[in-house]
């Protein structure tokens, strides 16, 4: 028995850091080391000219002499998460209850770059909500009832590209081949002029701009799970001593809704420039692409119902003979939400008897 309810509230915050952060060299160091790596006796070919190295060191026009730390451009070295929990319990000899509500929010290590270029934020964002409600009632001296209602919600938003692939691209792109983007005034088009370069290791004829790949598009996923259970325990001593009936009914419904919004992007390379006037021209790689977001989505889920009844007789005669008889019946039904074929629309059913 509790004179008054017991209430608990807990709020936590956490900072996560990367276990190991790669140290990236700057552009001039990269070019010098690259020239040294490919040089050999009798060959004085240098992929990067001294003029480009000197211009990068001097910090001249960053579109002609880019010096991009792609990892630092995309990733934060730490991320913050928070969680909160509220619960209350109480009751008396006739009834007791427990209720709990939990909330959790976490972000990834990506920087929120997409909102600098578009109207959406595609950074990793996870929200989790959990609700638990349990109620136990002693209706009579021989009758006990239990009811449980639970709800779990997971709401996730993330870039269209997997974070591992984004990390790999940031490791592949070198700091001096192209800038993140070119100035908007170099074209009369209203889309972002992403930097790029002809060639590449992906077999497409060009390199892949890590920032452009990251910020273009996003996906969302909402998952909900609802469970409910009802239990009845009835002693049947009025019929015969030691006889007891227990009934259980449970229900679970799971649903998932996913949406993907994707778009192409237009990328350019510096086709020519004049070192004396610092004027340059850019050329689009491939055909012009539509930057309008396209939408694709899917829904799925399932539900399950379960019923169980137990009739149990347990009695000791004259403190010597122990008699125990049990009869059990159960049945289960499983359905798919939104079936797409005749076969998948048919419920799966099971029945069982034991004694």
Residues covered by each model-derived region:
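Transmembrane beta-barrel domains of bacterial outer-membrane proteins
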Residues: 109, 132, 139, 242-252, ...
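Sequence/structural signature of outer-membrane beta-barrel proteins
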Residues: 16, 106-108, 154-156, 254-256, ...
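Outer-membrane beta-barrel transmembrane domain signature of Gram-negative proteins
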Residues: 66-91, 180-189, 263-355
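Flexible, surface-exposed loop regions and adjacent strand-edge segments
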Residues: 24-30, 114-121, 162-171, 261-271, ...
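One-face residue pattern on beta-strands with alternating periodicity enriched for small/polar residues
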Residues: 14, 130-132, 227-231, 248, ...
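Short, solvent-exposed beta-strand-terminating loops
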Residues: 16-20, 36, 102, 257-267, ...
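Extended hydrophobic secondary-structure segments that form protein cores and membrane-embedded regions
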Residues: 9, 244-253, 324-331
